[in-house]
Curated annotation (Swiss-Prot):
It catalyses: 2 D-sedoheptulose 7-phosphate = D-glycero-alpha-D-manno-heptose 7-phosphate + D-glycero-beta-D-manno-heptose 7-phosphate. This is Phosphoheptose isomerase. Its cofactor is Zn(2+). Homotetramer. The keyword Mitochondrion does not apply. Zn(2+) binds at residues 61, 65, 172, 180. Catalyzes the isomerization of sedoheptulose 7-phosphate in D-glycero-D-manno-heptose 7-phosphate. It comes from Haemophilus influenzae (strain PittEE). NCBIfam families: gmhA, PRK00414.1. GO terms for cellular component: cytoplasm.
Length: 194
């Protein structure tokens, strides 16, 4: 009944992953992001992650694997997904949803920390504001985007961009793969210090 559609979905996902892998710069950017985060941890810094919708779930997933575990039993790493419901509702109500992440960065972020922002369009105003707040605080910024990078193109210290222009879910599929690779590399790098 749906076998052709199922296969087409899997082939499209495979094609996008192959396209992403074929650009050697993407591989280098993933390594750069992992080292940036690891170096922050080694210097006493932390990661603040944020996103909207499915990207919000990915931001939480990343923070959970940093504080909890990925593949290895090891100490937890300092990470916070900006997801506290009372903070989000307070700032949305009092200031506007475009400030929900930047207010948190202003309150909690410190020089040497890393902001990890996800936006499939690269145009999320609340992530753009968080990037601006992070830079003001002396934080490093990693942006995971899609399409042409949107307004976030060129703003981050490291931008990992998925060049897909159709559906956000395809971009998110690569984002979660990259997050898992980052976790693996961070665990490798932090184990050197242990």
């Amino acid at each position: 009944m749906y076998l052709d559609q199922i296969k087409a979905e899997l082939v499209e996902a495979q094609d996008l992953l192959n396209k992403f892998i074929s650009d050697e710069n993407n591989i280098k950017l993933i390594q750069e992001a992992a080292l940036l985060i690891s170096n922050s941890f080694k210097q006493g810094g932390k990661v603040l992650s944020c996103g909207n919708g499915g990207s919000h779930c990915d931001a939480m997933h990343f923070a959970e694997e940093l504080t909890g575990r990925y593949r290895e039993n090891r100490p937890g790493y300092p990470a916070i997904a900006i997801s506290d419901a009372s903070h989000l509702s307070c700032v949305s109500n009092d200031f506007g949803y475009e400030y929900v992440f930047s207010r948190y960065v202003e309150a909690v972020g410190q020089k040497g920390d890393v902001l990890f922002g996800l936006s499939t369009s690269g145009n999320s105003k609340n992530i753009l504001n968080a990037i601006e707040a992070a830079k003001t605080k002396g934080m490093k910024v990693i942006a995971m985007t899609g399409k042409d990078g949107g307004k976030m193109a060129g703003l981050a210290d490291v931008e990992i961009r998925i060049p897909h222009f159709r559906y956000a879910d395809r971009i998110q599929e690569i984002h979660i793969k990259v997050i898992h690779i980052l976790m693996m590399l961070i665990e490798f790098e932090m184990a050197k210090q242990a």
